[in-house]
Amino acid sequence: MNDNPATDKVFKEVSSLYKQYFEYAILVRKWLEIPDDLSHREIGYGMLKKVDNRNMSFNTERDYLAWVLKESPFHLYKSLSYMEYPDIVGGAAKKGLFKREVAFDIDTHKTEKCTHDDSWICEECLGEARNQVLILIEDFLFPDFGLDEKDLKIVFTGNRGYHIYLKPEDPELLKRIEKWGKNERRYFIEYILGKNLNLRNMGSRWKNILVREFNKNKIATKKFEKTSDWKTEIDNRKDTTRRTIYETIDKVKSRLELDEKVMDDDIRLLRTIGSLHGYTGLMVKEITYNSLKNNQFDPLNHGVFSKFHKKMYNVKIKQELDPLTLKGDTFDHNSTEIPASYLLFLFGHGIDFEILE
């Protein structure tokens, strides 16, 4: 890798850990997702970068799994799109896109309560990601689109976010959704983000959401509930009230940190379920709506590959770090004995450390 023996040693050990994980995930537990209609899906992967290589495809599950076991990539992806020629370099037209999964990507940043560096994670920012998933589902996907929990696939990304796939049980509805083009997907996400909100003609869903928030801010809502022309009603309020109303609307519209490119890009790749996230070493893991709703899923516990939390290393960490808690154990730059789970996190974040004999 380079001329530094200590760095080489770390890289080789990390590579070995990823190989051990995939052998267990594939051969023992069958955790790794095999994208449906595999031969029409593009595969991408990365080692030191998110995506070093893409435009790959496999005709059989056997070939795909054999490749994953051999390469054991730090980052593993599949395309949302189904294509006639997934291994051709180029855009959707060259690849022959004929349908596409619809998925949301919630990717939160550090919150005001986080005390760590921007790239670190903690219970606060992970909790914010959870809250945003519930807002998306309960304020929009369930009431507006008639979906229920059986129609969704929720995946912890292995970092500060979740992927939410629309997978209706109704085959005709699924077929229609997967035939959506870029314009339909764009309209869908812009509606949820309130980008086309028309205060002269308020729809019922956004009206209900905003009335609820107005009540929290002690803004009288009776007249808003009876009219769709909110612009006129707002303009009739006092300056301070009017300012509070607009601030509340802007705050509600910015609640969701949705990656719009995931909805917009025809040939977007998403992380493969059952792989590891190369920046954190945490599992890309499918979870249930109820486990999220009832706060039963703890990413810093259930997202850790348990076998890696039992494999210990003596290390020397050469820079100051914010604390990180994995499976109830807290580590920082003063830690001298750490599990493989924390070692992968350090490596993924480019931390300067050395494995000791």
UniProtKB/Swiss-Prot annotation:
Organism listed in the record: Methanococcus maripaludis (strain DSM 14266 / JCM 13030 / NBRC 101832 / S2 / LL)
GO biological process terms, semicolon-separated: DNA replication, synthesis of primer
GO molecular function, one term: metal ion binding
Enzyme class: transferase
Keyword set includes Thylakoid: no
GO cellular component, one term: primosome complex
Protein name per Swiss-Prot or TrEMBL: DNA primase small subunit PriS
Protein family: Belongs to the eukaryotic-type primase small subunit family.
Entry annotation: catalytic residues: D105, D107, D259
CDD domains: AE_Prim_S
InterPro entries named among the record's database cross-references: DNA_primase_S, DNA_primase_ssu_euk/arc, DNA_primase_ssu_PriS
Assembly and binders: Heterodimer of a small subunit (PriS) and a large subunit (PriL).
Cofactor(s) demanded: Mg(2+); Mn(2+)
Purpose: Catalytic subunit of DNA primase, an RNA polymerase that catalyzes the synthesis of short RNA molecules used as primers for DNA polymerase during DNA replication. The small subunit contains the primase catalytic core and has DNA synthesis activity on its own. Binding to the large subunit stabilizes and modulates the activity, increasing the rate of DNA synthesis while decreasing the length of the DNA fragments, and conferring RNA synthesis capability. The DNA polymerase activity may enable DNA primase to also catalyze primer extension after primer synthesis. May also play a role in DNA repair.
A Pfam family the protein falls into: DNA_primase_S
